Amino acid sequence: MLMPKRTKYRRPHRVSFEGKSKGKNVIANGNHALVAKEGAFITNKQIEAARIAMTRYMKRTGKVWINIFPHLSLTKKPLEVRMGSGKGSPEEWVAVVKTGKVLFEVKDTTNSSKVEMEALRLASHKLPIKTKIVKKGAEV
């Protein structure tokens, strides 16, 4: 699973995912990309599930770029514990995704756009947000 090697703080403040993405909103590497249409927290397990879905479909004919990384830890207190006595322990790692962010990029060596589009469609079903598939050069 994806997670940072070291962090400055174990339990950071929660970051907002409202508004538009300021960075990573241009297709840099691949021919097609999966772009977020809404903001959310995406867990490391969801990113990994999407990556596996794409690479299994494309086999060895393509390359996948992942543009998001789960830097933020979310905490949770144990069940049936009274309020107070500090913040809970880190439960999972999430990536903060805002509207317009390029999540994944794909390039097929056989230059088959059908394969690229289908791989991104399969990956989009693994994510908890609405997404759209964009071709390089088109408006994100």
UniProtKB/Swiss-Prot annotation:
Superkingdom per UniProt: Bacteria
Any GO BP annotation: translation
Gene Ontology terms for molecular function: rRNA binding; structural constituent of ribosome; tRNA binding
InterPro entries registered for this protein in UniProt: Ribosomal_uL16, Ribosomal_uL16_bact-type, Ribosomal_uL16_CS, Ribosomal_uL16_dom, Ribosomal_uL16_sf
Membrane-spanning intervals of the chain: none
Alphabetical keyword list: Ribonucleoprotein, Ribosomal protein, RNA-binding, rRNA-binding, tRNA-binding
Ranges in coiled-coil conformation: none
Keyword flag Glycoprotein: no
GO cellular component annotations of the record: cytosolic large ribosomal subunit
Protein purpose: Binds 23S rRNA and is also seen to make contacts with the A and possibly P site tRNAs.
HAMAP family: Ribosomal_uL16
NCBIfam families associated with the record: rplP_bact (TIGR01164)
Family, as annotated: Belongs to the universal ribosomal protein uL16 family.
Subunit structure: Part of the 50S ribosomal subunit.
Name assigned to this protein: Large ribosomal subunit protein uL16
Organism listed in the record: Onion yellows phytoplasma (strain OY-M)
